[in-house]
A protein has these predicted regions:
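Short, charged N-terminal beta->alpha structural module
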Residues: 1-25
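FMN-binding flavodoxin-like domain, especially the glycine-rich phosphate-binding loop
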Residues: 23-27, 33, 38-135
Length: 135
């Protein structure tokens, strides 16, 4: 079973997760302060302010980075080089592979690409696997 850990502020990541879980049946867990994490999985978050990682996401990573296989982020291309920058920062700071970036709540093409990446690259992968940055 694939587990997805996500943080959503405006609802874009929530909508993305809803579509992914409806298609796949994967388990989604909304990040909450001090939540226990028993199963390893994939992080999906958003970029806030001007290319920053959300505080709740950052706290989650400090507590559970050893159980995160990959990171993906929602963003807005209007922010230019800051688009989805949270994923880049998390990938770099925690040595987690960057799976993908998607705009706002993602298109169906984004949803299918994410599912394909997780199924074929990161399902049951070992941490420390070679980074795949296709964002």
């Amino acid at each position: 079973m694939v587990h997805l850990y996500y943080d959503s502020r405006t609802g874009n990541v929530q909508r993305f997760i809803n579509k992914v879980t409806q298609i796949t049946g994967w388990q989604a867990h909304k990040i909450e302060p001090e939540m226990p994490v028993e199963q390893p999985g994939h992080l999906i978050t958003y970029t806030t302010k001007i290319g920053c990682v959300a505080d709740k996401t950052l706290a989650f990573m400090h507590a559970h980075a050893d159980k995160v296989f990959s990171v993906s982020s929602s963003g807005n291309r209007n922010w230019g080089p800051n688009y989805g920058l949270a994923a880049n920062k998390i990938s770099h700071d925690f040595d987690i592979p960057l799976a993908m970036k998607f705009e706002l709540s993602g298109t169906m093409e984004d949803i299918n690409q994410f599912i394909d990446i997780i199924k074929n690259q990161y399902n049951d992968s070992k941490r420390g696997s070679q980074k795949l940055d296709i964002a």
